[in-house]
Amino acid sequence: MPEKSNRRTVMEHFNPILGHETTGPKFITCGEIMLRLTPPNYEKLRMATNFEASYGGSEANIALALANLGVDSTFFSVVPNNSLGKSAVRWLRSNDVHCTPMILTEPDETPSNRLGTYYLETGYGIRPSKVIYDRKHSAITEYDFSQVDLNELLEGFDWLHLSGITPALAPNCRGLIIDMLKEAKKKGLTVSFDGNFRSTLWTWDEARDFCTECLPYVDVLLGIEPYHLWKDENDHSKGDWKDGVPLQPSYEQQDEIFQHFIERYPSLKCIARHVRYAHSGSENSLKAFMWYDGHTFESKLFTFNILDRVGGGDAFASGLIYAMLHNYKAMDMINFAVASSAIKHTIHGDANIT
């Protein structure tokens, strides 16, 4: 008899009861969900004797924020089939995120079979926040994604969001992200991408090479680095410039940068970035720039006190995606995105639960 194939469809990995029916545009994203451990009362990690446990991760935060705004939102990931993995899924489901395609793995599928973890030391006043990641050999980094039918996974969706964090985790994740981008393009999904560079996961050059490779498949670009676009690519971290881009640009500077992107990647339909002004560890201001429909727009400036800064960029992304899905006018799009980020800074936890 012929040997039985090890390839399985997404639905065979997980109980289909974990989905629910909604209407409207359908959104899907893919990434790692992590256990977050935070010392209470702004304590430093070296002082901590106990931790508050919650869950988060860039793509999961976006899925949850959109679900809370009423969008049909699905999250695809790999977690261990144990109490921690199931608790992460339960947290997503409790916030109306579809988890049907999520994969729960056994030790024979991912040898370490663990959930990624990170420790957050919340800043206060002049002391900034600090993060320590413990996500090496997590379940998603060791899973064989050739078992996943991406055509089936993306069937029926309108929008796919991906980031530069997931491909930084491991080679298998890089392959998955590129394959998802290509499949999404074939199926006609709108694709958003956030480079989201993490220096603890890979080098600047590795990130730049990979993220630049992704650009031809992207419709909506969030953030403007790290990409191969500039003549002096070695001078990316001096003064108030990064990757040849000013950290706090004028309107004219930002318009010129956007035009540079569009000249090289005319398939881009929208580019947006937010700009942060840090007055202290507990007070910031935000505004944003967006290129859309041939014009550059500048948002209002929002100033706010910070309860929890983690997930502010994800809230910006989810706000923009929501506004685009609902056909907001351009200025309303960018103002809603910045307002979403600002309000997230007043909410404890990773996600913008409003």
Put a short name on every predicted segment.
Residues 46-56, 297-311:
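Short pre-catalytic strand/loop immediately N-terminal to key active-site residues, enriched for Gly-Thr
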Residues 185-190, 265-269:
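A short helix->loop->beta-strand "cap" motif at the edges of active sites that frequently abuts
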Residues 300-354:
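Conserved post-catalytic alpha-helical subdomain immediately downstream of the catalytic base
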